[in-house]
A protein has these predicted regions:
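Bacterial N-terminal signal peptides
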Residues: 26-35
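Extended, small/polar residue-biased N-terminal targeting/export presequences
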Residues: 65-126, 172-174, 178-188, 196-198, ...
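Short linear recognition/processing motifs and adjacent strand/loop elements at protein termini
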Residues: 37-41, 356
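Glycine-biased strand-turn-strand hairpin within the trypsin-fold
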Residues: 43-58, 62-64, 70, 87-113, ...
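Short acidic, Pro/Gly- and aromatic-enriched capping/linker segments at domain boundaries
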Residues: 340-349
């Protein structure tokens, strides 16, 4: 989860008198060592002692490491090591990486199309992004990447891994995947320009299916536009499915805005930092964009962060039942702090659902557990017919079995979505 704070202004002092990272650290260490004899507390003295150790290690590495390394490389790696050791989502970003991140949240960038985290030294895939090389090649949420072009990923930071995976458009990269207990296998992906369409939609049997792939600057606006078009169109939309599967999250304020679209009142999420007194509560404003029509939310193990905020808020207010399987469980908030020569991505808080629960490392539990599966044997037993639904539409110019065939195909292709649509229809019938 990212707070949209990378637009902060750099202080006038920093603008007029930029200090290089190297000079600042040398000055800081020298100052601290000199302060050891000036009557500071034991805790402060211990801190200064550790900084002097850093200085010694830095110089030894410079003098004796097998390959020549620059001061900039060493300092950036030291900063990254410090932040990565805190949690997998904190990191130091060089100036170039900071610019890339700003492009990411705007909705277009180059790469493979996966959202990742680090776990036990390996790259863990939170989710593949729709219509990208990774998704088309069959990469799945929960996969681990152990090697990139034959090189182990152990020891890499997230940003270093991302940097390797990005590159010239069309240039292939081989990723080694571990999936469950199976043997590792290689997938060759060609890098592409990743243009994220954060909101997609389709209408299936008078149910609006709203697919949200990420929470970027375009999400709420796109969702509003689609819903207004559907509500004013010729089809009488009976209800909606909000599909958040394999949505890795994004911007906090967008997740709040999306939740607010479907709620009349009440808390959406609270954000709590280290200071227990410092609690930010975000609440809904009056106005349900679909005016109380049935809504069902779909989640899976690739639904993370902002997706979990939306699912948790709608679940706790009984606005929508949640279908699918338990979500990813990323309940932390990161902020981007611009500094000279880059930025710091730092975990500053955890978020809590309206019921007061943290989903960190636990996730959102669905109300109805529906694993994704290829339903083959069960198809023979299904007695579902389009004509069984109340107010089923007819069309004199088309095959009367067309919708029935569409639903049958949906059972095979996406059983979770089929169940969600069925649930919306049931809720719509109950409301009448």
């Amino acid at each position: 989860m990212i707070l949209r704070s990378f637009g902060q202004k750099i202080s006038p002092l920093t603008k007029k008198h930029p200090i290089s990272l190297k000079k600042f650290i040398y000055f800081f260490i020298a100052f601290n060592i000199a302060a050891l004899s000036n009557g500071y507390s034991e805790t402060t003295k211990e801190t200064y002692k550790q900084l002097s150790i850093f200085n010694e290690v830095f110089n030894r590495v410079k003098e004796r490491y097998v390959e020549e390394v620059t001061d900039k490389e060493l300092i950036e790696k030291a900063l990254n090591g410090m932040l990565n050791a805190l949690d997998p989502h904190s990191s130091f970003m060089s100036e170039d990486l900071f610019k890339e991140m700003q492009i990411d949240t705007a909705g277009a960038f180059g790469g493979l199309g996966i959202e990742i985290t680090m776990e036990q030294g390996f790259i863990k895939i939170i989710s593949p992004i729709d219509d990208t090389p990774a998704q088309k090649a069959g990469v799945e949420s929960g996969d681990f990447i152990t090697h990139l072009d034959g090189q182990s990923v152990v020891g890499l930071s997230i940003r270093e891994a991302v940097d390797i995976m990005r590159g010239e458009v069309g240039k292939p990269i081989t990723i080694t995947i571990v999936r469950g207990m199976k043997e590792p296998f290689d997938i060759v992906l060609k890098r592409a320009i990743i243009k994220i369409q954060s909101v997609k939609h389709k209408v299936i049997d008078d149910i609006g299916v709203l697919r949200v792939t990420t929470f970027n600057e375009q999400t709420t606006t796109g969702l509003k536009k689609i819903i207004k078009e559907l509500e004013s169109g010729e089809t009488d939309i009976k209800g909606y499915v909000l599909d958040l599967r394999n949505n890795p999250g994004g911007l906090l304020d967008e997740s709040i805005s999306v939740s607010d679209l479907f709620l009349e009142k009440g808390e959406i999420v609270s954000v709590r930092g280290r200071d227990k007194q410092d609690v930010q509560v975000y609440s809904a404003k009056k106005g349900d964009i679909i005016k109380g029509k049935p809504l069902v939310v779909l989640i899976n193990q690739g639904s993370a962060s902002a997706s979990e905020i939306v699912a948790g808020a709608l679940q706790d207010h009984n606005r929508a039942p949640i279908l699918g399987i338990t979500s990813f469980g990323k309940g932390s908030v990161q902020t981007i702090v611009p500094i000279d020569s880059g930025a710091i991505r730092l975990t500053i808080a955890k978020y809590y659902t309206p019921s007061g629960d943290s989903i960190q490392a636990i996730g959102i539990e669905p109300d109805v557990v529906v694993p994704q599966a290829e339903i083959k044997v069960l198809n023979e037993l299904f007695t579902f017919r389009e004509s069984d639904y109340q107010d089923a539409l007819t069309n004199e110019t088309k095959d009367p079995n067309a919708k029935e065939e569409e639903v049958k195909n949906l059972i095979d292709d996406d059983y979770q979505l089929f169940r969600a649509i069925d649930a919306v229809k049931t809720l719509a019938t109950v409301q009448k």
